[in-house]
Amino acid sequence: MGLSEAEWQLVLHVWAKVEADLSGHGQEILIRLFKGHPETLEKFDKFKHLKSEAEMKASEDLKKHGHTVLTALGGILKKKGHHEAELKPLAQSHATKHKIPIKYLEFISDAIIHVLHSKHPSDFGADAQAAMTKALELFRKDIAAKYKELGFHG
């Protein structure tokens, strides 16, 4: 399941593009998540009232949360699979406080792949998409194991 060094380099190359605009990428990813899977919006008291894409695009809170999500994910990706320290508090909050099912992490992973491909087609070809998909699967597998340790079966 681990990634090769070459795969990690593909992931981190496109991630550098994301970091140039974490808020913009994050907002677009969350909008795609919420539009594709409206049930996920119910987990966010702060955003439940946002019904249209225009409202979502106008929300500074959504933009800030997108920045927060991608900052955390970037920190995990940069650890190249050695993300235990970063993952533990994230799993704790998502399992016990927010109660985010693993399925929702699959949904946001799909949104990430889609947005990166649409925004960076020349840097996110088939090899990079496969590497990012693998990295996100590793993240989900490891967070699911933490969920299980915490007794959360979301």
UniProtKB/Swiss-Prot annotation:
Subunit structure: Monomeric.
Catalysed reaction equations from the record: Fe(III)-heme b-[protein] + nitric oxide + H2O = Fe(II)-heme b-[protein] + nitrite + 2 H(+); H2O2 + AH2 = A + 2 H2O
Covalent S-S links between cysteines: none
Example of a GO cellular component annotation carried by this entry: sarcoplasm
GO BP annotations listed: removal of superoxide radicals
Sequence ranges assigned to domain Globin in this UniProt record: 2-148
EC number of the protein: 1.7.-.-, 1.11.1.-
Keywords: Cytoplasm, Heme, Iron, Metal-binding, Muscle protein, Oxidoreductase, Oxygen transport, Phosphoprotein, Transport
Phosphoserine modifications at: S4
Keyword Protein biosynthesis included in the entry's annotation: no
Top-level division of the source organism's lineage: Eukaryota
Keyword Phosphoprotein in annotation: yes
Family per record: Belongs to the globin family.
Name under which the protein is recorded: Myoglobin
Species of the source: Indopacetus pacificus (Longman's beaked whale)
Intracellular or extracellular location(s): Cytoplasm, Sarcoplasm
Sequence positions that bind heme b: H94
